[in-house]
Amino acid sequence: MKAPATIVILIMSLISVLWATADTEDGNLLFPIEDFIRKFDEYPVQPKERSCKLTFWRCKKDKECCGWNICTGLCIPPGKK
């Protein structure tokens, strides 16, 4: 009796994936996730909002600040870690 239940679960999973794909641009399921990550990549959390540690994120070509030294709130230029 496990086989019919497994088939039903697989079919329901396929339907939900197809349903979600239809709602995104170009059928890319990761599109909303990429936007969410990009938002936090471009606007990093300020030092007061995090614990005291060294934090880096991806540097953009047009940005001078590539990371925060959380303890002092200093902006670290690209290439210096």
Swiss-Prot record:
Modified residues (Proline amide): 78
Keywords noted in UniProt: Amidation, Disulfide bond, Ion channel impairing toxin, Knottin, Neurotoxin, Secreted, Signal, Toxin, Voltage-gated sodium channel impairing toxin
Localization terms from the record: Secreted
Record propeptide residues: 25-50
Residues spanning the signal sequence: 1-24
Disulfide bond residue pairs: 52-66, 59-71, 65-75
InterPro entries on file: Toxin_23
Domain of life from the UniProt record: Eukaryota
GO CC, one annotated term: extracellular region
Expression sites (tissue/organ): Expressed by the venom gland.
Stated role: Blocks voltage-gated sodium channels (Nav). Intracranial injection into mice causes lacrimation, slow breathing and death. Intrathorax injection into crickets causes death.
Protein name per its UniProtKB record: U12-hexatoxin-Mg1a
Comment field on protein domains: The presence of a 'disulfide through disulfide knot' structurally defines this protein as a knottin.
GO terms for MF: sodium channel inhibitor activity; toxin activity
